[in-house]
Each structure stands twice: as structure tokens, then as C-alpha cells.
């Protein structure tokens, strides 16, 4: 089941990407401003655990070498 995490001013939506590997869209004001693309299932699970723990994504790397700024 894909998840959505609500944060102050934005949401993070998990989406299918490559078989069991998922991406995470960062959506602010109805627009996707960044997409986190984990490099492995382990990284995906770490991302989910961090989001489940309440972490925000500002300052995270998107998996493509870019820093996410909210």
C-alpha cells in the first residue's frame, strides 16, 4: 500500500517506480516540486522509516544529486 505523509506546507506521496522500488513526490501548493528516487530497496525503506518518524525532507538529497528545498 502506498503512503502519503503530511508535513507543514507540503505532502510526500509514495508512488510506484521500478518493480518493488518506489519514488516519493514532494507536493507543495498542488505542484510536484521534487521527486526522491532511492537507489535501492534499502534506501527506500530508510526513507519510509524517516518519514514515518516525522522527519521533513527539506535539505534531503533527491537521489539525483540535487538538494530538496521547501
Segments the model singles out, each with a brief description of its role:
Residues 1-21:
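Short N-terminal "domain-start" leader segments
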Residues 31-70:
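Mixed-charge, Lys/Arg-enriched low-complexity segments
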Residues 16-32:
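Short aromatic-glycine-(Arg/Gly/Cys) micro-motifs in beta-strand/loop hairpins
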